[in-house]
Amino acid sequence: MNRVFNVTCLSALMASLVLADGPKDNQSAEVRPIPPPGIPVPEQEANALKTGLAALRTAIDAAAKAQSKNPMLPDLLPDVEIYHKAVDWALRYNEVFKPAELKAAAELLAEGMTRASQLAAGQTPWTKQTGLVVRAYRSKIDGSIQPYGMVIPGNYSGAPSRLDTWFHGRGETLSELSFLDQRRKQVGQISPANTLVLHPYGRYSCANKLAGEIDLFEALAHAAKFYNIDTNRIVVRGFSMGGAATWQFAANYADKWCAATPGAGFSETPEFLKVFQNEDVYAAPWYQQKLWHWYNATDNALNFIHLPTIAYSGEKDRQKQAADAMEAALRGENMDLLHLIGPGMEHKLHPDSLAEIERRLVDIVRVGRAEMPYEVHFTTYFLRYNHMHWVVVDELEQHWERTRVHAKMVTDSAVEVKTQNVAALTLDVSAGHSPLSPLKRPTVKIDGQEVSVSRPRSDRSWRVHLRKTDGKWQETLRAFENDGLVKKHGLQGPIDDAFMDAFLMVQPSKAGWNPKVDEWVKLEADRALFEWRRQFRGDAMVKADTAVTDADIAANNLVLWGDPQSNALIARVLEKLPIKWTQQMLTANGKDYAAGSHAPVLIFPNPLNPAKYVVINSSFTYREYDYLNNARQVAKLPDWAVIDLTKPRTSQGPGGIADAGFFGEHWEWKKN
């Protein structure tokens, strides 16, 4: 295919997809469904596809049985199952969006049957295939099958290879069926020479946030089992919504990639919505404005010192705002953004600009990712993102405030560190990489204080834990002083964080104390399952409270619906939760509420397994109104809230918010 034609046509397609939103989608009382309803499927074609689905299901089961002793079966079976899911869900959930997709569905069933037969015979030729390859994995989050696409160069020989990821644009009709059809037929907007390209599905159209963020890492881990990926030469790339994804992956994981090439999209929430939606969100509650830090790349611009970045915008594209905002943020950190402008372009990639990006990437990739920079500069706002090269932030003084670490290897026995809002950190250099002398006891000068610390080990690794107590830094034997409650990486909240790892929805088996609360719980719990499927493309795992096992508690974040009367697990953990809850009264953060008309939502370390979360009465916290623009798809509730059930549930909230806030660093109540 002609390269320029390929780029131009696909860019135009992306433009038509992303511009589906706009100021007309600012009416929270008139929210159109995302994804939209599909077209009617003629009965004859529907029946033929259902027959094909039944045959494919039988073939998949036969292949699984035939290969039951194959240790690679868990990684191979999803490559077949995804064909069944794609067609099944399109029919089951009215997600056939155009007549051509019916032909594509038949093709997918045929391809799935071929793979099932091959797998049953112990053959997996698609794992050695070059060109366009559909792949899939089973997610740890909800057990769902999630697709991704690979583009394998014809000369790929198994040698360590550069890999580029390409994050797709907004696609309200991008079902699994549509995505698989694209990944079978379209190379996409990039195809660099001698480069593997991975196209994540990203859990549909969420700008690769939350579970969509984890999707990238699960897809990369699966791909690495079959392709020899050079981990020092991974490039994150995308355009439009995919450009937004690139900005956030670049900002929050700057030490993982070799380069980033974001195009258009958005790089933060409030200013983009002002420009693109004519929507002023600065009246949002204070805790929502704190939560913008999660995905605002502008707030974490310092991290780009570790990641070569090439931004692109069309000259006439309103989404040029994304790179303009990043340019200003980087300038504030004394960095100058390389921002290529496509002359005369609206929401499209200019072929000349793409060629310039590719030319520059060749030089960047030749150098590769820095494995052991002598200087590290890192900023974050919460401990989900707590790591940059050899600096690990273990505890904060206060979550959702700007946190910074500047660390430098000065000599072979001296390290300088400056911190802001850090209570404990670890300096952790992997084996073979420490530039410090193993013969000298090094000194860490941290915030002006000199601390004599442990020497590097004989394998040239070096790990030092430092903690600040009463304003004084000292080395400690481990990262955490005791086993008490503390906010740390993976256990820091907010509510939405629980849905980025394995979770189990636990439903009540009895009536609760108050009918109004029961009614609200039923509506919200049902909505949680419905919206998880629609927005994150999986069936959430569900059990009744009486069916939950010790193994479930060990393996999952528990999402408990109900009250202490209706849900036995809420009753079990209530004593060790910070709330007080009786039939008459709910007490949260020192305030009392009538239990008949209020309900708590919160996240907390699970008293039954403190390595996991317990969540009370909540799923992911953005709602239907937020689906209309990807920049709105950010966390809407903090660690806890009290819901006023006398106020209606809406497209923006589960009811009235009587109060809400974050827990302190030891999961204690704190004043808002």
Predicted regions and their residues:
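C-terminal catalytic histidine-bearing segment of alpha/beta-hydrolase fold enzymes
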Residues: 316-415, 421
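Gly/Ser-rich "nucleophile elbow"/oxyanion-hole loop immediately N-terminal to the catalytic nucleophile
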Residues: 155-159, 208-241, 251-257, 303
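Amphipathic, heptad-repeat alpha-helical segments
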Residues: 22-80
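Active-site machinery of serine-nucleophile hydrolases
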Residues: 160-227
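Catalytic His-Asp charge-relay segment
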Residues: 306-313, 338-339
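A domain-start/cap signature at the N-terminus of enzymes
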Residues: 22-39, 93-161
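Solvent-exposed alpha-helical segments and adjacent loops
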Residues: 426-672
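Mobile cap/lid helix-loop segments that gate and shape the active-site cleft of serine hydrolases
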Residues: 171-183, 255-307
